């Protein structure tokens, strides 16, 4: 596999990527996940996004580089994971997914896990 694109910052390490993908999988089961760059953009604009996950191996990467700018405007943490195929599998679809958004739900069963991962992503951004 080639080196990840240098524009894909901050890139999660293997351990954090696994935690993120686990939370993504649980959020997909609880209908708390939006898949794709367009739907992720919509959640940011509506203010219902907890954090954004993007694939670092997206080609061309420019098709999702509007998301970090929007995230910074809306004060939402974001992170890149190494593989779009792994992100697609975690989202529960058979196709690669280049971006996903975990949405807000205060009554969620995985609220604590979402906040734990969100804190780790925020420390990457510092």
Curated annotation (Swiss-Prot):
Pfam families: Ribosomal_L7Ae. InterPro entries: eL8/uL1-like (IPR050257), H/ACA_rnp_Nhp2-like (IPR002415), Ribosomal_eL30-like_sf (IPR029064), Ribosomal_eL8-like_CS (IPR004037), Ribosomal_eL8/eL30/eS12/Gad45 (IPR004038), Ribosomal_eL8/Nhp2 (IPR018492). It comes from the Eukaryota. Its main location: nucleus. The keyword Ribosomal protein does not apply. GO terms for molecular function: U3 snoRNA binding; U4 snRNA binding. Keywords: mRNA processing, mRNA splicing, Nucleus, Ribonucleoprotein, Ribosome biogenesis, RNA-binding, rRNA processing, Spliceosome. It is found in: Nucleus, Nucleolus. Component of the U3 snoRNP particle. Binds to the C'/D and B/C motifs in U3 snoRNA. Component of the 25S U4/U6.U5 tri-snRNP particle, a subcomplex of the spliceosome. Binds to the 5' stem-loop of U4 snRNA. Belongs to the eukaryotic ribosomal protein eL8 family. PANTHER family: RIBOSOMAL PROTEIN L7AE FAMILY MEMBER. This is 13 kDa ribonucleoprotein-associated protein. The gene is SNU13.
């Amino acid at each position: 596999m080639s080196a990840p694109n240098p524009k894909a910052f901050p890139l999660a390490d293997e351990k954090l990527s696994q935690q993120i993908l686990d939370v993504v999988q649980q959020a997909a089961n609880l209908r708390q996940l939006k898949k794709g760059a367009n739907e992720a953009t919509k959640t940011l604009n509506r203010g219902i996004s907890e954090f954004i996950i993007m694939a670092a191996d997206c080609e061309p990467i420019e098709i999702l580089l509007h998301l970090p700018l929007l995230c910074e405007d809306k004060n939402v943490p974001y992170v890149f994971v190494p593989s779009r195929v792994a992100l697609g599998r975690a989202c529960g679809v058979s196709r690669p997914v280049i971006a996903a958004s975990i949405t807000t739900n205060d009554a969620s069963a995985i609220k604590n896990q979402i906040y734990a991962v969100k804190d780790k992503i925020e420390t990457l951004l510092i």
